[in-house]
Structures are given as C-alpha cells and as structure tokens.
C-alpha cells in the first residue's frame, strides 16, 4: 500500500493508494481505527483503453500508470489527482460518493509529478515536483488549470541527495502551510522532511521529521501524510519498502510542538502504539474466493494485470468456476486477463484447483508469483499432451523450465511466499487425487525490481503461447492448434492463508 493519502469524514477515515497498472485502480480504503482497513471502491475501472493498457504491439504500462494519488474533500465533493507518465497527462477525478467506484474524470495535458492538492486562502492549487517544487493554480471547481493563474516555482530543495524531495502532501494549520516530502540523503536512509511557511512567497523553513529504517538498512519509513482524529489527536501514515513484498503503510502517533509536527517517538519509530478506538471489523485486503458467484463481478481484493478483455472471463459460463479463455501471448508479462491480488507478510500460502479438460494446444494456465522476475506453476498443452510446467525468470532475463507429464483432468496448484527475515522465496507445488504435494523446480528468489515497481502478487493466468526454441520437453514439436480453437481453463476454490 504505497503512497498513502488520507482524509476523515466524521469518524470514518479514507485512504487511497497506488496500484499503477492493475485494474480497477486507485483503491479507496475505509477504516474507523486507522489500523484495520478494507477496500470499499476504486476510483477508475480503467485509466485508458489503448494499446498500452491492452498489452498490445509490445506496449505496456509496467512501472507506470497511476502514481501517488492525492485525495481531498472540497465543497461537498471528493477529489483525487494523479499523474500518468506513460501518457504525459494528469488526471483529476471527482465524486459525490467516495464509496462508489467509477469517478468522473478530467484530463490535463501536463505532467504534475507526485502532486498534492493545496487549498490556500480560498483557492485550489497543485504542489508538485522532484527537487524543484512547483505550484499551479486550479479552476475554482477543480475542472482544470486556472487561465492566467499562479504557475511558478515554490521552492528548491537540496540537490546533494540520492533522491531529492518528492511525494508531496500539503496541509494547512493555524495559518501555516506545511509541505511533507520524502528524500534520501547519500549517506543515510529515506526520511520524511517538512517545509513550512505562512505565505506562498515564503520564506520556507525546513525540518527532518522522521529518519528511521526500523533495522532495514536504507529502507527508511517516509512519504505519507498526517490526519487528525475527531477527538483532536494526530497520526501519521507513511510507508516503508519491505523488499519483495513491496511497500507497506506505517502508522504512528504525531503531535504539534512549536508549530512543527513531531512524528513517532520524537522522530523515531515507535515500538508500540495504543489506539483509542474500538477495533473496526474490516474485510481483509486479501481473501480466499470460491469463485461461486451469480454474476461476473469480482471481489474487491482482485485486480487484473492491465485492462482485461471482459469477453474472455466469466463466473457464470461454468457456475462455480472462474473460466479464462486463452489469448495469444509471448509470455506471462504480455498475457491479458491475469487476475491478481496482494500477498502478505510474513508469508502466505496460495492454492487453487485447475480443470484442464477444455485447454487446447499451446495453452498454459496456472498460478504465478508476479513481478519482473516472476515464477509460474501450471499445466501446458504440447503435442496434445499435458505437462505440469514450472517457469522462472532468472536474474539475467532467461527462463528456467521444469516439466513432468500429467494424466488427470484436474490438478491442485500451490505457491508459498516466504518473506520472513527478508528471505524472499517463492516455492511451487502441485498435487493430484493420486499424489501428495510435490515441489516443482527450485524456489524462486523474489526481488523487487523497478521494471514493474510493485511488490509480488499472486496471479491466476491462462494464455496461448508458442514454444519457441525452449521447448517444455525435447519431443514437443510446437504443433499448431486448429483454426478457431479457443482453449478455456477453469479455476475454483482459491485460498490464501498465512504460512
């Protein structure tokens, strides 16, 4: 849950996070205790319907898409703003109901990197940038940029950094403007810094608010916002890089001292945090799913890798199963209709039942550990025969494949994700009615890489792929499928539970 931004309505807190190229995107989470969160809506079903988001012609939005959304309540309406670098646009979405998916969209043909809404003396602005921080005035109704409005550099932050200030979150308190940023000095960990001024003209004062990695060298807790409870207590929600599992939110107490926010225990991470709220019975952000649904609607824990082809998946065509029709792909990262959800620390076990009876020549279906260096376990059809196939992408970009014959129509697949002590290993298994669990291939060394820029997810996939030069087994001849053949894989009883 990276890049958090929060607001409070009465005694309910709402948080937005970044999901980049996963669809639907920009989840809105709800809580009453700041600790237990549940997904209640998504800002958009699709950012755009183009080649990039359909994974066509070698194009994709990996590492791009929706970034660092700012969330605000303004004049009885909710607003969200984020940039898409792949399209060179900034989007402002709005709604009357924050718990309803599919907000109204406004496009701005300009990039405002890591922006934050700012409402200062009756006017709305965007504050944005990396290192050099700019400010641009919006129209009164936030429908676009104000013609001849303020549009200038607001301040320039130190340049002798591994990462200069970015990830802005702006707030106003007692006549002062506060700008929160993440930065990364060359000789330390990522940290949270604050600039303040009582005028847009400055001068701006600066203070480091949090510089603590919690024992994970270099992985300082930073980038996020402050929120005030209904009782007047303050809290900070930042995030931390946790290796292969991705980025997780970090909650801590905050207070105000001499006009500055003080985070945690005087700028250090607290070991414990007592919250003065009744525990909120939230639905988990990861969940098992029987796939027994009366309509073609996903549980909110699920997201597709890029835009799905809605004609190629169904719960209702084979009741009790998730049916995925195979589309052509060169591999996992070009395959459409891969259905994903988050994994969880310190580790989790994911299982699913796969029916292969309607798969066709060249089809490959199963479970995956999805990131740039991915791993797969599933069933491949080759020369009319079935093989249990494990695939792993290596550090140098190659593929390691392990296969063995399969006779049954139904198979159970499993991936264990182990993040304990940053071991970051995924292990792949299968079993049939006649066999016990059997590991296939070596454990995958999971690595958070910047090509996808997200933590590992569990994924359910099915696509049609040519063998190419690396065949599953030497006897495979890459036989062509019959024209018009459409293979289907069916999945049921997906489970996810702690290791």
Listing of model-derived features with the role each one plays in the protein:
Residues 1-499:
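Carbohydrate-active catalytic/glycan-binding domains of CAZyme proteins
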